[in-house]
Amino acid sequence: MNNPPPLQRLDHIGDVLAFVRVADAQSFTAAAEKLSLSRSAIGKCIARLEQSLGVRLFHRSTRSVSLSDDGRLFYEHAQRILSEVDNATDAMASRQQAPRGRLRIDLPVSLGRLHVMPLVRGYLRRWPDVDADISFSDDYTDLVRDGIDVAIRIGGEADSRLVRRVLAPHRLITCAAPDYLHRYGAPATIDALAQHQTLVFTHTGQPVPWRFTVQGQERQVPVAGRLRVGHTEALRDAAVAGDGIAQLGAFLVADDLRAGRLAPVLESVAGAGAPVYAVYPHRRHLSPKVRVLIDDIAAAWSTDLPWRPYA
C-alpha cells in the first residue's frame, strides 16, 4: 500500500471489533455472522481500518484469510483495547447497580466501634437490601482466607492480593492528664520517659513499643510500665484518671484533648503516623455494596474527620 499520511485517529471501535472477529475466525463470512452484519459491511470496516493505519492487515485469497505481519502486531493491541472497553462498560454498569447482598466487614475494635459503626448504620438505613456481618479485631485478618469483603485498618503492610485506599490521615498521640503532669511534670525528651509512669498497650500479651518520628525517621521506644493493658479504651481511661502517660491513636483521644482531660507531651517528636485504609481483596470490579460503603466513609471523613486537628 502507499505510505500513509500521519496516523489518523481511530474513530470506530466497531472497526477494531470487526478486525478481531475476522482474525479469530480467519473468515469474513464467519465474522459477519457472529456480528450479525453483512459480509460487505465487514469488508468496509477492514478497509476503513487499513486506510486509517496505512497498512495491510490481512493476506487475502479466494480460499483463505490470514494476518499480515502488521496485522499480527495490531491484533495484540486490538485485543487489549477491546478488553479495556469491556472492563469500562462493566465498571459503569456496576456503578449503576444498587448495593445488595451480604457484606462482611472487619473493623479494629475501638476505631470501629467509635467512628466506623455510626457510618455503617447510616449506610444500612440507606440500602435496605444489604445485610452486614461485622467482626472486630485488632489483628490483621486474612481477608481472602476468611471471605471478608472489606476491612478498615490503621497502617499495616501492603499485600499484593489486596487493594488499599486511604480514607484519612492518622497518628499516635503521647499524652497524659493535667493532674498527672501537675504532680510529676512533663518529660522533656524521649529518654526521660524512663522516669515516668507509662501506660503500656499489649498485643497478644506482648508490650507494644511506642513510636515517634524523629527528624523524619521513625524511632521505636520500648516502654515498661506497671500497668499493661490489652484494650486501648481501658488504657485511655487510665490516662484520663491520671495514672500515667500513654501513647494512643488520635481517633481515641481527640475529644479528651479538646476538652482538656488530656494534654499532649513530647510534641517536638510527634507520634508516628499511619493512614486509615479501606482494604479489600483485589477483584476485576468492585461490587456496589463495597464501593458505596467505602465512598460513604471517605466522604464523611473528608468533611468532618472526628480526630481533626490531631491527625
Regions found by a protein language model. Name each.
Residues M1-L10, E76, D129, A250-A259, ...:
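C-terminal effector-binding regulatory domain of bacterial HTH transcription factors
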Residues V16-F19, A31, S68, G242:
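Hydrophobic two-helix hairpin corresponding to the core of helix-turn-helix DNA-binding domains
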Residues R21-S36:
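Short helix-boundary/capping micro-motifs
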Residues S38-A41, C45-R48, L119:
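Residues within the DNA-recognition helix of helix-turn-helix
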Residues T62-V65, R72, S83-D106, W307:
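Short helix-loop hinge/linker segments at domain boundaries
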Residues R100-V163:
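Central regulatory/effector-binding core of bacterial HTH transcription factors
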